[in-house]
Design a protein with these regions (language model features):
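N-terminal topogenic module of multi-pass integral membrane proteins
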Residues: 1-45
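Juxtamembrane "helix-exit" motif on the non-cytosolic side of transmembrane helices
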Residues: 15-31, 89-100, 153-164
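Hydrophobic, membrane-facing alpha-helical anchors
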Residues: 29-34, 49-70, 87-92
């Protein structure tokens, strides 16, 4: 279910970000390459990776529903999703440098970083043999992604919607909310798997 929701949020984000950039470009606005609060030229690139992320989430949803392992054919979409999250993270670093006095931009950057770490951990767990400490990494990165991606970003989007300041640019945050939910599911599954593993004595 979480992968299905994430796929929908990825596709919605791709449409919203592209429309925001297209309308701003069509209106003759001078667009920077990276911007945090307005349209930018990266809005023509990010939607491609968001679509790949949605496709990968759909593959995962169908695979888990059928009880089958993921095929290597879906690795390209997952890799594209990770590249997109990396680009999104770089965008936030460049467009909003961190400082102690700028708490919200710092939390935005931490949200992107947490989700990027989760994407890397999930790719390794899905397509490579799992090591003994794999569940610990999935648990840690999953909870971090849920805390920053779903709890913080979701609350921020809700606040923007209530105050009437929500814009199409904020659509780029939707994948963070979805991947945070996936992170929570991954963390809970990692705990369940680790408990079923027999104890090791030295």
């Amino acid at each position: 279910l979480t992968f299905s929701v994430t796929a929908i949020l990825f596709f919605a984000a791709a449409v919203l970000v592209f429309l925001d950039t297209f309308f701003a470009f069509g209106a003759g606005q001078r667009l920077p390459f990276f911007s945090l609060t307005s349209a930018d030229l990266a809005g023509f690139i990010l939607p491609v990776f968001f679509v790949l992320g949605g496709v990968w989430a759909l593959f995962c949803a169908m695979g888990y529903a059928a009880g089958k392992p993921q095929q290597m054919g879906s690795f390209g979409a997952g890799f594209g999703m990770t590249i997109g999250m990396f680009l999104f993270c770089i965008k936030r670093f460049v467009a909003s440098p961190t400082s102690i006095l700028r708490i919200m931009p710092t939390l935005d950057i931490l949200s992107a970083l947490a989700v990027l770490l989760l994407c890397c951990a999930m790719l390794r767990a899905v397509y490579l043999p799992r090591g003994a400490s794999e569940e610990k990494h999935l648990f840690l990165f999953g909870l971090l992604a849920f805390l920053f991606g779903t709890c913080f970003t979701g609350a921020k989007l809700a606040y923007l919607a209530v105050t009437g300041s929500l814009s199409l640019t904020a659509g780029a945050d939707l994948p963070l909310v979805g991947l945070g939910l996936v992170g929570l599911a991954v963390a809970l599954h990692a705990v369940h798997t680790d408990r079923r593993r027999p104890a090791r004595y030295t």
